[in-house]
């Protein structure tokens, strides 16, 4: 984890590397990054993590990082394929949960209300968009609140992110290839390449449903929350959240993409597994870090509850029943998770007082992109996602040992 307390993490890294090269578990205590307590790894979890990563390697899984923290123990982790606990990777939609916490902090500071209407914040963009709307669509837009954006019920019936990205890619496929890199896809760069701002694109998409009635996963909702944070605070969301969350936790400034100078709220955050663990612990502890209340507790309690129904992985041990404030939730409160494309996860299991984080690579070869062009198009159409496999492995090996 990129912390200012470099000594702690130098020790942790050394221990992790030593453990990875040994045939038995390391029992030497290490300082906990959140409390400074001297802790040792849970040997059962340590063994489970190794076994999980061994199976991932055998099955050619794209999993490239897993780390586990449980109260009273030091964290355990494995980072194959040339990466380690300090390697930052694209979080994809895990970013959305961080966006939600920025909203929560702004609410706590009195700068924003969840019941506040969105349209009056963007008068020029809304006036232009309404020229092409029916009366019903105008009414839907004018009813839209900040809370509707948080729970993915903004009145769109489809996710415009996929549609716009596909449209731009098809217009200039070879020019768009430069935005596809080995470890990540620069969606923000692809959108910035075009003149339209994100609010213009968002308001220009049909509002055919009444806000709050229908769940529709929509990354532009998250990006609009970032736009709102900037309007209400005068800062980019990346700067705002760094000062109020990352820095107080001892974390370095995050790598975060922007669209026309505005922090990408729906994707674009790059984190290491240690940074992901720290965030998961922050959520688990009710928004506190080392005794300091960073996220308002009342906001966080609502954020991790089912606010709208939307089942994911139905019938599995890791299933979720709904969506909170930019996070997948379970109605009984036993599980909530930030989920990103291709297998990025921050999983919080309150009754186990544990956090599991996982990162995964993209399932296509960016160095020979023409060979895998069909996979790229499947990605843009929302049809390519290998994210279930890491959860299966985690519930097979890690969760039983917690």
Annotate each PLM feature.
Residues 73-78, 119-120, 163-210, 235-254:
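Short, charged, amphipathic alpha-helices and their helix-cap/turn boundaries
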Residues 251-253, 301-355:
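Active-site Gly/Thr loop motif
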Residues 10, 15-43:
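Bacterial Sec-dependent N-terminal signal peptides
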Residues 335-402:
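Structured C-terminal helix/loop/strand segments within mature extracytoplasmic catalytic/sensor domains
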Residues 52-83, 346-347, 353-357:
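A short, well-structured edge-of-sheet supersecondary motif
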Residues 72, 89-115, 149, 225-229, ...:
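Active-site SXXK
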Residues 221-228, 267-288, 344-361:
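Active-site-proximal alpha-helical segments within enzyme catalytic domains
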Residues 109-161, 204-206, 210, 220, ...:
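Active-site helix/loop module of the DD-peptidase/beta-lactamase fold
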């Amino acid at each position: 984890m990129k912390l200012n307390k470099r000594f702690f993490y130098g020790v942790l890294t050394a221990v992790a590397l030593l453990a990875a090269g040994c045939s038995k578990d390391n029992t030497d205590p290490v300082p906990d990054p959140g409390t400074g307590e001297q802790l040792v790894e849970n040997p059962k979890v340590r063994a489970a993590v190794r076994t999980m990563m061994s199976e991932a390697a055998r099955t050619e899984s794209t999993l490239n990082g897993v780390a586990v923290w449980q109260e009273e123990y030091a964290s355990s982790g494995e980072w194959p394929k040339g990466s380690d606990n300090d390697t930052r990777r694209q979080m994809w939609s895990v970013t959305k949960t961080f966006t939600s916490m920025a909203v929560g902090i702004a609410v706590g500071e009195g700068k924003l209300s969840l019941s506040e209407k969105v349209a009056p914040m963007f008068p020029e963009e809304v006036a232009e968009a309404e020229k092409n709307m029916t009366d019903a669509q105008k009414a839907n837009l004018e009813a839209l609140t900040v809370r509707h954006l948080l729970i993915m019920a903004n009145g769109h019936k489809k996710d415009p992110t996929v549609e716009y990205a596909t449209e731009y890619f098809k217009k200039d496929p070879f020019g768009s290839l430069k935005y596809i890199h080995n470890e990540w896809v620069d969606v923000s760069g692809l959108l910035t390449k075009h003149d339209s701002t994100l609010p213009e694109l968002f308001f220009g998409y049909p509002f055919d449903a009444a806000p709050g009635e229908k769940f529709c996963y929509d990354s532009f909702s998250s990006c609009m929350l970032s736009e709102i944070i900037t309007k209400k605070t005068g800062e980019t969301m990346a700067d705002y959240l760094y000062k109020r969350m990352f820095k107080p936790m001892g974390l370095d400034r995050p790598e975060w993409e922007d669209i026309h100078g505005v922090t990408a709220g729906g994707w674009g955050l790059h984190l290491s597994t240690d940074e992901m663990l720290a965030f998961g612990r922050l959520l688990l502890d009710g928004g506190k870090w080392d005794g300091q209340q960073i996220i308002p507790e009342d906001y966080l309690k609502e954020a991790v509850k089912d606010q709208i129904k939307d089942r994911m992985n139905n019938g599995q041990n890791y299933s979720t029943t709904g969506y909170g404030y930019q996070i997948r939730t379970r109605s009984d409160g036993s599980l909530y998770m930030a989920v990103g494309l291709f297998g990025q996860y921050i999983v919080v299991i309150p009754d186990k007082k544990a956090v599991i984080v996982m990162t995964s690579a993209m399932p296509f070869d960016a160095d020979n992109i023409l060979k895998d062009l069909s996979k790229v198009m499947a990605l843009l159409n929302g049809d390519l996602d290998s994210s279930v496999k890491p959860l299966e492995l985690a519930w097979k090996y890690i969760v039983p040992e917690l």
